[in-house]
Amino acid sequence: MLSLVQKIIGSRNERFIKKVSRIVQKINSLEPEFEKLSDEQLKAKTFEYRERLANGEILDNLLPEAFATVREAGKRTKNMRHYDVQLIGGIVLHQGKVAEMKTGEGKTLVATLPAYLNALTGDGVHVITVNDYLAKRDAELMSDIYEFLGMSVGVIVADLNPQQRKEAYACDITYGTNNEFGFDYLRDNMAYEKEQQVQRSRNYVIIDEVDSILIDEARTPLIISGASDDSSEMYNLFNRLVPYLEKQEKEEVENEQEQRDFYVDEKSKNAYLTEKGYAKIENMLKKEGILEEDDNLYSPHNITKMHYLNACLRAHSLYQLNIDYIVRDQEIVIIDESTGRAMPGRRWSDGLHQAIEAKEGVKINAENQTMASITFQNFFKLYNKIAGMTGTADTEAFELHSIYGLEVIIIPTNKPMIRKDHHDEIYGSVREKFDAIVEDIKERISKGQPVLVGTASIEASEVLSTLLKKKKIRHNVLNAKQHEKEASIIAMAGYPDNVTIATNMAGRGTDIILGGNLEVEIAQLEDPTPEDIAQIKAEWLKRNEAVKKAGGLCIIGSERHDSRRIDNQLRGRAARQGDPGESKFYLSMDDNLLRIFASQSMAERVKKGLKGGESLAFGFMSKVISKAQGKVESYHFDIRKNLLEYDNVVNTQRKVIYEQRQSLLEAEDVSDILADIRIDVAEQLFHDYVSAGSMHELWDLEGLEKALKSDFMIELDLQKLYEEDDSLGEEDLKRLVREAIEIEFVEKTKNLDSGAVRQFEKFSLLQSLDTHWREHLSSIDHLRNSINLRGYAQKDPKNEYKKEAFELFSTMLDNFKYEVISSLAKIRIATEEETQRAQQEWQESMSDIKAEHESVIDNNQRHDEDEQEEAPKVQQVRREGPKVKRNDPCPCGSGKKYKQCHGKVE
C-alpha cells in the first residue's frame, strides 16, 4: 500500500527535490543577467547583500541571487560551473539538513554556495573536514571564489599558534578539522584572559563526511588532560603475568574440566576472569609479594590492581598489532576501525593504552587526569545551525534525525549511475576467499581493468599483498603504514590494469579517475609547454577510453564491514559521474561479522555444504549478512545513544561552569560577584553550626568561632555576645557572621591599589573554579565507571547517575565558593606585578596539558548491563541519611572533621 502511495505522490525526498527545483529554476533564470556584469559589479554584490540584510531582509530571500553570484564567480575564477544538482545540494545545506551526494559529484564546490550566503551575516561560517590535508586542500581550491567576492578564508590546522588561530577564526569562512575546532573550544574555556581566546561565535557549520564525524566519532570524546601518577611498574608486572592465563572458549562451560582462567566478549570488547582465573592470579601476585597471604583481589584497597589486571587482560586477548593498532616511532598508534587510518595523538582510556604499551615493549606514558572534555554530539549542538554532506547517510538517517534533528536528503546524480553490483561470494575459509580474490584480480587486469581491493585491516592487506607477489602481480598497498603516499597511490589507482589494496576507503577524500589523475600528472611536469600538456591530455584520453571499455574501476571487498554505510562508501569509489564500474564482495564464514553475529547453526550448515574452493552466491546469504550488519548497527546506535544520555548530564553542568567562567573572564571588576559569594558562604558556614529553626541549646557557637578563626582569620566571640544579650536570635547571629566576613575583606583591601586587588580577585576565582571543575570531572568519571553496580541493588543506574552527579555538582559549587573566600581571607593580596607573575606561573604549570581525541572503542562498554565494573575510586555522594556537615566527624571513622578529611578540597 505504501509503495502504491509513493508511486502516486512520490516519496518525501522526491517531493522535497521537486519543491527546491523551483528555486533552482529561479537561480538559472538569473544566470544571463549575472554573466553580463563586470567583475567589479559582481564583486559589489556582496556589499549590496550585506546592506539588505542590515535593513531586515532574510537570508532565504537572498538565496537565489547569492547562489547565482557564487556560480558566476566559480565560472570566472575556476572555470567551474555549479550543476543544477549542486545548487539543490547547496539549498539543502543552507536549510540545515544533510545532503547525501555520491562520490565525484563535487561536494567541495557545493559547500561554497551556503558558506557564502551564511557568511554575509558577518558571524562566520565553519567548514569541517576529516583531516588537515583536506582542510588545506579545500580552502586553497575554493579561496579564489570567496576572495573574488570579498570574503576572507582561514584554515585551522594542528600546527598553528594561538594568534594564527585567532586570525583564521576572524575570517568570514574558516576550514578545519572537527578535532581542532573542538579543542579550541575547550582551550578557550581554560583561558585566563579574554585576549587568549581564539574562537568567536558558533553560527553555522557545514560538516563534510558528516556521517563519519557525527556517528563514527560520536563515541570518542575530545579530552584535554594533564599527567597523573606514574604506574608503569604495575602495568609491566601484569603484562608479564597475564600470558600465563588460559582462555576459555565461551562464557558457560558444562563441567569443571573445561573451565579456564578467562573468557572474552568480542561484541563488547571485554574480557572477564573466571573464579579459577581469580585464584590463579591471586597466587601469582602473592608469589610476587604484591598481595599478602591472607589478602584477596576483592578487597577495596586492591581496586587499582584490578584496574591494571583488566586493562592488561584486554590488551592481550582483544587488541591485535596491525589490526587495532600499529607501532610507529616507539609509540602505539590506534587504527580507526571505520577508515583504516592511523590516528596519531589519540589514546584509549581506562588504562588500555598503557597496557598495550607494556605489551609491545614501548615507553609507558602516564595515565592522564581530565581537565576538560566534550563529545562531538554536544560540541556541534552549540552551533545555531548544522548542515552536512556525505556520500552515504541514508542508512543512518534515523540516528542523525533522532540525535541531531538533521534530515537526510538524497541528491540526484548529475549523470545516471551505471555501476554493476555483483552478488557476494561466500567461502568456507579465509584462505579460500583470498585465493578467489587473487584469481578474480588476474582475470580483470588481463583485460586492462583497474582494481581497488578494500580490506578491513592492515594484516589482511599484507596477506593479500603477499599472495599477489607470489603470482607476480604488481600492485600498490595503501594502509595506515603508508599514509604518506596516499595521494600519489590514489592518483594512479584508475590506470589500466592497476591494482590497489587499501584498508577501508572511508574518508579518503580523493576521487579515483579512470585513466589516472590528469591534473596530478600535469602538476608533476617542470615548466610544461602547451605541447607537453596537449600530449599528456591525449595520452590520458586514450587510457580513459581503454578503462571504460574494460568495464571501469572494479571494487573488490575482502569482507563486509560491521556497517552497511562503510561498505557503500567503498562501492561508491567506482562509477563516478556516469562512468562504468563494478563491485563485488568476497566473504568467508570465519570473517568477524559472520563469526560473531551470524547464528552458529547457520554457519555450521554453510561450512558443511561447501567443499574446498566452492562458494555460495545467492540472495539468501545477502539477507543473512544484512541482518548481521543490522544487529551491529543497532548495537552501536544503542551505545552512542546511551553515551549521549550520560554525557548530557555533564553537558548541562559544563554549560553552567563555562557560562560562569566566561562572565568572570569578561568582567572588569568581580567585587560584586565576590560579595554575593561571601553572603552565600556566610549562610553556609552559619547553618553548618546553627541549624535553621533549632533551639539555642543546640547551637554550636564554639565550633562556629573556631571555623571563623581557622578558615577566615576572623576573631568573633559569639558566645560572649549571646551571653551579654540573650535576645539575639538566629538571624541576628547570622548577620554578625556575614558582617564580620565582609569587614575583614574591606579592611584587608582598603589601603591597596584597587586595580591590583581586582586583578588578583579575578585570577583567584578563575584558578579556583578550574581546580574544582577538574576534580569534579575526575569524580564524575569514577562515578560513571561504577554506577552500573547499582543494577544489582534493583536501582536504575541512569537515574542514580543523574541524581548523584547533581549532588556532586552542588557540593562542588559549595566547596568552590567556600574555598575561594577562605583562600582570599588567608593570603596577602598581591601587587599587580605579583599577580601577573602568579598567572604566568600557573599557565606555565598548564603547559604540559595534552589535547587528545580519546578512543572509547574500549570505553563504550561501561554502560553494558553485563559488564563487570570497578568500584569507585573516590567517595560518592550517596546520601540516604542526613547531610554530613563540614564540621561533623567524618563518616569514614578517622576521627577527623569531615572538612579536614573526605570533605577537604585540595
Swiss-Prot record:
<dbReference type="InterPro" id="IPR036670">
    <property type="entry name" value="SecA_X-link_sf"/>
</dbReference>
<keyword id="KW-0997">Cell inner membrane</keyword>
<dbReference type="GO" id="GO:0017038">
    <property type="term" value="P:protein import"/>
</dbReference>
<dbReference type="InterPro" id="IPR001650">
    <property type="entry name" value="Helicase_C-like"/>
</dbReference>
<dbReference type="InterPro" id="IPR011116">
    <property type="entry name" value="SecA_Wing/Scaffold"/>
</dbReference>
<dbReference type="Pfam" id="PF02810">
    <property type="entry name" value="SEC-C"/>
</dbReference>
<keyword id="KW-1003">Cell membrane</keyword>
<feature type="binding site">
    <location>
        <position position="86"/>
    </location>
    <ligand>
        <name>ATP</name>
    </ligand>
</feature>
<comment type="subunit">
    <text>Monomer and homodimer. Part of the essential Sec protein translocation apparatus which comprises SecA, SecYEG and auxiliary proteins SecDF-YajC and YidC.</text>
</comment>
<feature type="binding site">
    <location>
        <position position="511"/>
    </location>
    <ligand>
        <name>ATP</name>
    </ligand>
</feature>
<dbReference type="Pfam" id="PF21090">
    <property type="entry name" value="P-loop_SecA"/>
</dbReference>
<dbReference type="InterPro" id="IPR020937">
    <property type="entry name" value="SecA_CS"/>
</dbReference>
<dbReference type="GO" id="GO:0046872">
    <property type="term" value="F:metal ion binding"/>
</dbReference>
<keyword id="KW-0811">Translocation</keyword>
<feature type="compositionally biased region" description="Basic and acidic residues">
    <location>
        <begin position="877"/>
        <end position="888"/>
    </location>
</feature>
<dbReference type="GO" id="GO:0006605">
    <property type="term" value="P:protein targeting"/>
</dbReference>
<keyword id="KW-0813">Transport</keyword>
<dbReference type="GO" id="GO:0065002">
    <property type="term" value="P:intracellular protein transmembrane transport"/>
</dbReference>
<dbReference type="GO" id="GO:0043952">
    <property type="term" value="P:protein transport by the Sec complex"/>
</dbReference>
<dbReference type="InterPro" id="IPR011115">
    <property type="entry name" value="SecA_DEAD"/>
</dbReference>
<feature type="binding site">
    <location>
        <position position="901"/>
    </location>
    <ligand>
        <name>Zn(2+)</name>
    </ligand>
</feature>
<dbReference type="Pfam" id="PF07517">
    <property type="entry name" value="SecA_DEAD"/>
</dbReference>
<dbReference type="InterPro" id="IPR004027">
    <property type="entry name" value="SEC_C_motif"/>
</dbReference>
<dbReference type="Pfam" id="PF07516">
    <property type="entry name" value="SecA_SW"/>
</dbReference>
<feature type="compositionally biased region" description="Basic residues">
    <location>
        <begin position="896"/>
        <end position="906"/>
    </location>
</feature>
<keyword id="KW-0067">ATP-binding</keyword>
<keyword id="KW-0963">Cytoplasm</keyword>
<dbReference type="InterPro" id="IPR036266">
    <property type="entry name" value="SecA_Wing/Scaffold_sf"/>
</dbReference>
<keyword id="KW-0472">Membrane</keyword>
<dbReference type="InterPro" id="IPR014001">
    <property type="entry name" value="Helicase_ATP-bd"/>
</dbReference>
<feature type="binding site">
    <location>
        <position position="890"/>
    </location>
    <ligand>
        <name>Zn(2+)</name>
    </ligand>
</feature>
<feature type="compositionally biased region" description="Basic and acidic residues">
    <location>
        <begin position="853"/>
        <end position="865"/>
    </location>
</feature>
<keyword id="KW-0547">Nucleotide-binding</keyword>
<feature type="binding site">
    <location>
        <begin position="104"/>
        <end position="108"/>
    </location>
    <ligand>
        <name>ATP</name>
    </ligand>
</feature>
<feature type="binding site">
    <location>
        <position position="892"/>
    </location>
    <ligand>
        <name>Zn(2+)</name>
    </ligand>
</feature>
<dbReference type="GO" id="GO:0005886">
    <property type="term" value="C:plasma membrane"/>
</dbReference>
<dbReference type="GO" id="GO:0005829">
    <property type="term" value="C:cytosol"/>
</dbReference>
<dbReference type="GO" id="GO:0005524">
    <property type="term" value="F:ATP binding"/>
</dbReference>
<dbReference type="GO" id="GO:0008564">
    <property type="term" value="F:protein-exporting ATPase activity"/>
</dbReference>
<keyword id="KW-1278">Translocase</keyword>
<dbReference type="GO" id="GO:0031522">
    <property type="term" value="C:cell envelope Sec protein transport complex"/>
</dbReference>
<protein>
    <recommendedName>
        <fullName>Protein translocase subunit SecA</fullName>
        <ecNumber>7.4.2.8</ecNumber>
    </recommendedName>
</protein>
